[in-house]
């Protein structure tokens, strides 16, 4: 999207997560004001006005991103999805943002069908609503215009920037993990198990463990992996953790080891000063309780 935008236009009335986030992304990329009203024919025909979630048209060449005109049996999709697709980020967003597909379902199918698709009771949808969602959406809906420098616009820019940065950086992060990690097979008295070890680098990433679970998914090893080992960003040693709450690892079993300075009481994470891979494997072996 290299077009110079004059402004972003979305529907008046109640705001929803999809149009809010779509506006956040475009505000972060273009730094322009956001208007909340019905579009004119001239605005729909203008490639310098982004029309979000209103207008009855999906015309990326004119920056029109509405989905309400799609047939009832169309795959669940929302205005945020259409914007991300136009930016070439949709596939990565669907891979990296677990919340995106439920958001598409909620906007296109409503809470009842979304609950059935998720396999939960209808009331669970309401139980997951955050006061942050309520406040941001209400404040966004309250005003007909939001300009750079104003509180809500600046918050939206930050949200959009964080989302874009996360999507764009995670792809690079997965490549980094592929270059600097090793897959371990650890032998223990209860049998063998798999762990992913991320080597320490200089400089160290700000969140060393970020993306490791996604990397395991990408390798197709989700059903095989048991533990993760990664550099401790607060010290010179390593963190050890269960892979997605795998019940085979209980790190309270290594809490009394002399080189372990922290083990969570629930056993899902521990920190050690050890750096020798052989010792790290031994700590995992001691923590393993079986499949």
Q: Predicted regions: what is each one?
A:
Residues 18, 27-31, 36, 61-62, ...:
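Generic marker of "main functional regions" within proteins
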Residues 4, 13, 17-24, 45-47, ...:
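C-terminal accessory domains and tails appended to enzymatic cores
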Residues 6-49, 56:
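N-terminal ordered "arm"
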Residues 49-135:
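A basic- and aromatic-enriched beta-loop-alpha substructure that forms the phosphate/nucleotide-
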Residues 9, 66-67, 150-153:
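A near-ubiquitous, low-amplitude feature marking generic local secondary-structure context
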